Amino acid sequence: SLAVDNHMICTVILNGKRFFLDGTEEYIALNDYAQRIQGKQVLIEDGQNHMIDKIPEFAAERNKVNMLHKVNITDDQLSGSAVLEYNGESKISVQSVYAAIKNDKKAKSLSDFARSGNDNIDVSNISNSDFNDRQKPLQLKFDFKANNQVTKTGNELYVVMDWEKDFN
């Protein structure tokens, strides 16, 4: 069917290496490829000849989100710092959403994003890497205070760590 074969990309051959450029991917890094075209066969026009190649495939690890939280418990309140790092498809998703937000709402949106929409979390000192740098991972750093995340029962503390509610 033509429906599966109607996506055009550009191939640049530089110093014997092939780079596949997809104009529909606004934030993708050079030498990185959207998951939807990875592993697909490509037909490359070369004057009167043609070449057949395949878009490289990457392991899921390439799209990893790293989250590092350093947490303190003081008076039944969590506080600390966090570093979130986005790679591959997850990075592109964050970049696309951020670019679509009006400039006067970007700071609030970053704050909402950092606290995962959880009203019990206050964030401050937010900093981020360059949203336009396609070659490096995207990082978001911030300090936080989390209310209503610690329950004390006798000598035991029960701590809510799944702020994004991934496991609900």
Name each model-derived stretch.
Residues 2-168:
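A sensor for short, sequence-defined functional sites
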